[in-house]
Amino acid sequence: MSFPKTLNVPDKSSLLVPQTTKASATGPTTAVSYETASSEIRSIRESPYLPSSPVDSQQFDGRSIISTSGMSEYIADLNDLPSIRHDINPTSIKTGGTGSRSFKFSNCFQTLDSELSNMDFFTKYISISKGDDKAQFNNKLKHFFIFSSAGKPIYSMNGSDDIVIGYMGILTTIVSSFQENFNQELQVLELGQGLKIVAVNKSPIILISISKLSFETVESVHLQLDTLYCYLIGILSKSVIDKHFNNRLNYDLRRILSPLDFENLDELCLNLTYGIPNTSDRTQDSTFGLYTSQVLLPLSRESVKIRHTLRSKLNSIVNTNNEDVLFTILLSGNGKILNYLHPKQHNLPNKDLNMLLFIIHSLLKNQSQQDEDLWLPLCMPTFNDHGFLYVFVRQWQDLVLMLISGSKNSFDALKLSANEICTKLNNKQELAVKLINELSIPLSIEVPFVFKHFIYKDIRLNQFVMSELPTHEFSSFQFLKCYNELKVSQAKIIKHDNNLNYKKLTYLQDRDITGFMLMDKYYEFYCIIERSSEQETITSKKLIQISSQIIRWCKKNHARLFVTI
């Protein structure tokens, strides 16, 4: 094995743009809570992981969600709920070559370019462009700017330096005016028609986003800006950034950022806004997972389904007595955590773990050879934003092993531990085959065909699982938009009661899809169904019934779906 790679980290206005539709314009948004139903379901206080009543052994086989039993507890006393009906002319629904619905960006926006193809629309309004064309710059629906308190540019999602410098000068003036004239920090300017300017001041760094996407909330844009800031802290640390700006206020931070860092910032901007990959090496599922963990379900992390006994055996294999190893993480080939070992007194927050996985993925994709180890210092912003942890990374078959230490001199010790772990894995080929087989089974095959996608989050663990996205292009954006509007609708009508475990539900319709949300204090469940020409009406009872079956299945398979050991 060759010596590992080493990453050395040194100690204007709205203009003429297409306006997005408001949330209320997605068709008649209907929200129903159990508080307003005919009976309030006050008696449902089941345990967080087990059904409140015994489940017949034939109803669930540990794999299948489909049930032949009658109506579930969620349906009782909901006779007054209206039918969920897709009021769309069947001729307006187009199908692609595979029979799936053809998504069009122009259906989501009020724009004169309704005849643009998806790719043309994406290129004109969404894709990242660093050119000098000011009209092209103004067309973009989303902008991110990062600059110093002195107005020195650090990063821009779109535009060349000539264009960006002028905008950053204006934004610096606006931020300074708020500080001087109002004695407060600029946080958000809402200018109508969905246009908003959101700012986060992390002196000596200022991050600003200009969003023309009406479905985005101020909170979600704040989370996006915070993620970009965490990336900078992750590769540099707060101490290094402060040191440079303390020495010179107008320091150009771009001097210590690599080309890969700017590529990663581009990737993050597109992922966190649209759930769409910027490069071909990332899949829709991975980018949508990043969006979900950082924005839709903030501070959560995605898990992957494997048998509990298999996860336990992997735990015993990757567990090491090496005192230099602080954290051990085993990843699947698609970047999801299979095993995570940490000492009782220390734990990496999900926010840091998600950023760690993103950075490691970006480094691995740029490796010249897969048999090379990586050794790099990274700062974990929430864990400790002033220091570094040292990460050893090795790929074994389709898995990724990460050993993390607090000592910069622990490379040899961590490499020795990695050798021992890989030897154990090589001696357990039968286990490796079982693992690869289980990871190859998509979660979507266990979901009723009526569902196009679902997300299930365990609130106590702050972990979620979701089914795979449909393969047709840009479907992730349509789902992302629907889920966001679901959350906004839910937030307006749901009243939380800490003493009672009320179930809460809401749904909305957006052209040919219906989004549905069901939650209590133990879980959050989101799903999307798609209207077919053969089935124009889905009753509320039927939708809740199938959703409850998926929820029960997730609870029954809790140990398989989530990292609990």
From Swiss-Prot:
Keywords: Autophagy, Endosome, Membrane, Protein transport, Transport, Vacuole. GO terms for cellular component: fungal-type vacuole membrane; Mon1-Ccz1 complex; multivesicular body membrane. GO terms for biological process: autophagy; protein targeting to vacuole; vesicle-mediated transport. It is found in: Endosome, Multivesicular body membrane; Prevacuolar compartment membrane; Vacuole membrane. Residues 1-37 are annotated as: Disordered. Transmembrane segments: none annotated. It holds the Pfam family Fuz_longin_2. The keyword NADP does not apply. It is a peripheral membrane protein. Residues 16-37 have a biased composition (Polar residues). InterPro entries: FUZ/MON1/HPS1_longin_1, FUZ/MON1/HPS1_longin_2, FUZ/MON1/HPS1_longin_3, Mon1. Coiled coil: none annotated. The keyword Protein transport applies. In complex with CCZ1, is required for multiple vacuole delivery pathways including the cytoplasm to vacuole transport (Cvt), autophagy, pexophagy and endocytosis. The MON1-CCZ1 complex acts at the fusion of vesicles with the vacuole, through its regulation of the SNARE complex during the coordinated priming and docking stages of fusion, and particularly at the stage of tethering/docking. Belongs to the MON1/SAND family. This is Vacuolar fusion protein MON1.
